[in-house]
Each structure stands twice: as C-alpha cells, then as structure tokens.
UniProtKB/Swiss-Prot annotation:
The lineage of its organism: Eukaryota, Metazoa, Chordata, Craniata, Vertebrata. It catalyses: carnosine + S-adenosyl-L-methionine = anserine + S-adenosyl-L-homocysteine + H(+). It comes from Mus musculus (Mouse). The gene is Carnmt1. GO terms for molecular function: carnosine N-methyltransferase activity; protein homodimerization activity; S-adenosylmethionine-dependent methyltransferase activity. It is found in: Cytoplasm, Cytosol; Nucleus. N-methyltransferase that catalyzes the formation of anserine (beta-alanyl-N(Pi)-methyl-L-histidine) from carnosine. Anserine, a methylated derivative of carnosine (beta-alanyl-L-histidine), is an abundant constituent of vertebrate skeletal muscles. Also methylates other L-histidine-containing di- and tripeptides such as Gly-Gly-His, Gly-His and homocarnosine (GABA-His). This is Carnosine N-methyltransferase.
Amino acid sequence: MQRRQRAPPASQPAQDGGRSEDVEVQFSAGRLGSAAPAGPPARGTAEDEERLEREHFWKVINAFRYYGTSMHERVNRTERQFRSLPENQQKLLPQFPLHLDKIRKCIDHNQEILLTIVNDCIHMFENKEYGEDANGKIMPASTFDMDKLKSTLKQFVRDWSETGKAERDACYKPIIKEIIKNFPKERWDPSKVNILVPGAGLGRLAWEVAMLGYACQGNEWSFFMLFSSNFVLNRCSEINKYKLYPWIHQFSNNRRSADQIRPILFPDVDPHSLPPGSNFSMTAGDFQEIYSECNAWDCIATCFFIDTAHNVIDYIDTIWRILKPGGIWINLGPLLYHFENLANELSIELSYEDIKNVVLQYGFQLEVEKESVLSTYTVNDLSMMKYYYECVLFVVRKPQ
C-alpha cells in the first residue's frame, strides 16, 4: 500500500514535500465545476456548486465506462455499411470484416485500461470526496464527452510513450532549456525554485521539471486528464507495462489497415523515478480561481495553454499577480482558441501581436521571442493528414 502525504494548499507552492518510491504524487482539488464557465460565472450557492461538480465527476467516470459500447456501435455501423455493398464488391475485400474484428478486440482492451483508470480515481483527491454514484449504472455518454475521451487516449502518446518523444522534444525541451538557463544549479538551489505548470495535461512536462530537482506543481482542470495523470503518476512504475490502441477511432487517412490498430506502450519511463526529496504535486481546478496568492512563484511555464482561455487577458492578469518580482513566464504554443464559434460561450480571440502588447503593458520585460517553433499536437505519425503549428515561444520577466 502506498502512502499519501497531505496535499499543499492549492493556491500555494508545495513546501519541502519529500518524495520517494512509497509516496504518491499529491492531487488536491480546487473548484472544478460542471463545465468551463462563459466569462465571470454567476455564483450559485456553495451547495449548488458542490452538486454540479459531483455530477460532473460521475459524468466523466460514466464516459470512461461507456467507451466500449460507443466504439462497438461505431464499428457495427461500419460493418453494416460494408454488408450493404453488392456481394461482388464485398468479395474484393475478404480481409475487411477481419480487420473490423481486430478493431473490436482493440476496443475491448482499451476499455479494460479505462476501467482500471477510473476504478483508481474515486478517492484520488487528498481534500475532497465525491460520494457514491447516485445512478449506479452506465448511461449513454454525449458525443462531446466521447470525443474528449478519445482525445485523452492520444495524450498518452504525447506524454508517456516513446512514439511521442519527437513531439515532446519540440514542445517541452525549449521550455526546459529556458528554465535551466534562468535557474542554473550553480546559482540556485533547485528545490527552492517554485515552478507552476498550468494546463499540465497528463503531467509529463511538470514531471520532467521535477526530475531536474525543481519544486514543481502541475495544474489541470479536466477530469479526463486528471484521472489519467493520476493513474500514470501514481500507479505505473514498470516501464512500458501498459498498452493502448489510440488510433482505432481514426477511420480516414490510413495508409495501411495495420496502422489503425497499432498499439503504443506506456509509460516510457518510470514515473516513480523522481530523485529522493523531490517536490512534485498536482492540483485540480480552475487556474484563475485556485492561484490567488500574490508573488508566490519563481516561474510559470505554459505549453499549449493560453488559447484555452475565454479571455486570455484574465490569464495574463493571474500570471502577473502570482509571479514573484523577478520571476519569469515561459510560454510555448499556438492560438487555436478553444471557445471560438461556440454558442453562448465568451471567447476573446486576440492575435499574438495584441497579446504581446497586453503583456508589455502589464509591465513584463520581453527576454526571448521566437515566432515559428514548429510543433504537432497528439499527432498520428503514420496518418496521411497531419496538422503542424508554428508556435510562439516567449520568455518574459516580472520586474523586481
């Protein structure tokens, strides 16, 4: 049985949190809510917020449990359409039904992993419990939730597989390089350098920072990500022990049928291999609500994060307030605004030029700027279609 340490206050960097093989990564919960609020939320009672958050928690768990049913329906539809072809055309592809059967086996395997993940997350938070599932049975999940879940499976590729190494090198290495440059071990005690990684996803960037000896805390809002990162960070100690089939949902742009059903192994490293005395934790909740203590962080590292805001200026304001004087903000990512064109959602879509002007008006000093850092995001490396982002990398400093 692994033992847990008490989680640090969600709005503060962890202090002197020892980490060894028998100590789990601490997960503490702030306010997560039922969905991302459109602008300033209209506050209900605390009881209403707790109820909505509890419902959302179980709704996401239900999506994990419903995955197999949803995906089998998708494959069955494909088979029905194939069987509707003239018999002479079906005979041209005798291997096609066999391929669908292979996909079904992959679905069943993915479902086993997803059930393992959620079976371990009921009591994952140090400071919050969500009771028991009031419904008690698996219900159909929304298309939105199933898309989020399929996207989460691809996050395992990006963060914790050998296949995702090239993508991590493109996205994470430039950030880590700037951290090392600004906080060299010759002049800093890394354990005293508090680094925050908002939008931590499955936690690999934050983990890599902690591996260097820095005191690091990841923050994530999505239960899909939180359940999965808890599983990897706290339940996976054997390299490449687990297998997933992340590409079986992609029925287009496959060069070969085998490409669709190829597996990935995870984790490619032992997440428990952090150095003795490491200070690493995760918080769950809205970045802007959880982090309210002024002048608390030496460094904030954001990767593919700032375009998740309804209003990116709110993010800039929060970062300005919580950074220590002399602290730095490192950002890498595109501006694919998540709430653009969504009905009833506030979405302020600024150009990089506008964001840069706002950042400078707050008082940040620009130290590094690269406007064409080429990267992908959860890319299928064998797909016939790939998206590439020309990301912006900047480093700004809050004056002393």
